[in-house]
């Protein structure tokens, strides 16, 4: 496996539940190195730009509203096969379908308030990291 970087966002629902530290502990136990991190409040422009690929989808407005509803923690995780391993740790988008022990099974409440975001490919990770960290 290659050393990769991936973007992780702890979403407003998980931040509001005060589980940032628990999620970071899970990242570290899974062998990820947290190489960049910041807590920010997304506005409509920043959230809308990040999710621009979904602009024509029916859930877009609700997604932007949710992502701007409170602060988020944006992080860059580094590790062997980071993109796929992070997605496995997150679990299925719908927490009702997420495997026991995944972040979404443990911390998410709905398909919308699903606790975390993770890049879906190495290419997406590169683009998403640049979007938030300018690299």
UniProtKB/Swiss-Prot annotation:
PROSITE patterns: NDPK (PS00469), NDPK_LIKE (PS51374). CDD domains: NDPk_I. SMART domains: NDK (SM00562). Gene3D superfamilies: Nucleoside diphosphate kinase-like domain. It is found in: Cytoplasm. It comes from the Bacteria. It catalyses: a 2'-deoxyribonucleoside 5'-diphosphate + ATP = a 2'-deoxyribonucleoside 5'-triphosphate + ADP; a ribonucleoside 5'-diphosphate + ATP = a ribonucleoside 5'-triphosphate + ADP. GO terms for cellular component: cytoplasm. Signal peptide: none annotated. The active site is at 117 (pros-phosphohistidine intermediate). GO terms for biological process: CTP biosynthetic process; GTP biosynthetic process; UTP biosynthetic process. One of its GO terms (molecular function) is ATP binding. Keywords: ATP-binding, Cytoplasm, Kinase, Magnesium, Metal-binding, Nucleotide metabolism, Nucleotide-binding, Phosphoprotein, Transferase. Its cofactor is Mg(2+). Homotetramer. Belongs to the NDK family. Major role in the synthesis of nucleoside triphosphates other than ATP. The ATP gamma phosphate is transferred to the NDP beta phosphate via a ping-pong mechanism, using a phosphorylated active-site intermediate. This is Nucleoside diphosphate kinase. It comes from Marinomonas sp. (strain MWYL1).
